[in-house]
């Protein structure tokens, strides 16, 4: 059985959560052509990098012609193999070939040098999408300047701010209700997204495991106790501090 994050993974750009600006940028670029292009998608874990990368790939390539690679295995020999595979393409349907490179900040120095050349001559039916949790020009441990590589890519930076997290909370609440896990108000889901640092995948995992319900129920108990606490006394003040610390730490 698929995890909740896979079961509810968006199948269209309209379903991507909390990344309206990034989706608009991607769609504008795709409208000018799919192939012969590399993408660099950066953002925190669980914000939608893999989803957007898959949607980009799906826009021009059939699933059989989408290959997922880990950056750390991209040796010169592997890159040569990838480049040779450009020659093979679908004869019907979507004719493109897509390569999704995960954890791109793990690229090796020798791979980066080859990629600088490869990206300059990508065939029109080929698309490469790099994803990384790191951003900026100092992201390779053994290759300080990332600018030469990133400048050859269409750069998409995913958000993890208040508006993005609000959209994630709304989506998580809807999914929880679909799964018959209800009874919590909007604020509980907003808190849960913040506890997961804007990682929707992590929150869905907690919903699936039951940890979300346990935590949300406990937090509701603490809030109820705090709200019902009588006139301030020395003992009450101590308990208020304890409850506030528990709510902040949970």
What does each of the following model-derived ranges do?
Residues 2-44, 84-92:
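Pre-Walker A (pre-P-loop) alpha-helix and adjacent loop at the N terminus of AAA/AAA+ ATPase modules
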Residues 11-12, 62, 70, 218:
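Short, solvent-exposed coil/turn linker segments
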Residues 1-2, 49:
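Initiator methionine at the very start of the polypeptide chain
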Residues 2, 7-11, 63, 101, ...:
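A generic, residue-level signal for flexible/boundary positions that often mark functional hotspots
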Residues 28-69:
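Walker A/P-loop
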Residues 24, 28-29, 67-230:
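Non-catalytic interfacial helical region
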Residues 225-250:
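C-terminal engagement/docking regions of AAA+ P-loop ATPases
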């Amino acid at each position: 059985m698929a995890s909740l994050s896979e079961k509810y993974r968006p199948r269209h750009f309209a379903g991507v959560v909390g990344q309206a600006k990034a989706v608009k940028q991607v769609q504008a670029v795709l409208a000018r052509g799919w192939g012969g292009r590399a993408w660099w998608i950066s953002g925190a874990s669980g914000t939608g990098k893999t989803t957007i990368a898959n949607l980009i790939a799906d826009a021009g390539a059939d699933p059989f012609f989408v290959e997922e690679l880990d950056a750390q295995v991209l040796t010169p020999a592997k890159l040569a193999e990838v480049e040779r595979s450009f020659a093979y393409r679908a004869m019907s349907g979507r004719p493109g070939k897509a390569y999704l490179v995960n954890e791109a900040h793990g690229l090796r120095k020798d791979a980066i040098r080859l990629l600088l050349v490869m990206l300059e001559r990508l065939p029109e039916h080929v698309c490469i999408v790099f994803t990384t949790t790191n951003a900026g020009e100092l992201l390779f441990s053994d290759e300080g300047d990332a600018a030469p590589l990133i400048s050859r890519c269409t750069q998409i930076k995913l958000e993890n701010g208040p508006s993005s997290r609000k959209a994630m909370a709304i989506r998580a609440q809807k999914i929880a209700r679909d799964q018959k896990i209800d009874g919590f108000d909007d604020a509980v889901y907003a808190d849960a997204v913040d506890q997961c640092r804007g990682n929707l995948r992590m929150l869905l995992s907690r919903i699936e495991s039951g940890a979300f319900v346990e935590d949300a129920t406990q937090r509701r108990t603490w809030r109820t106790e705090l709200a019902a606490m009588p006139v301030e006394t020395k003992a009450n003040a101590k308990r208020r501090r304890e409850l506030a610390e528990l709510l902040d730490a949970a």
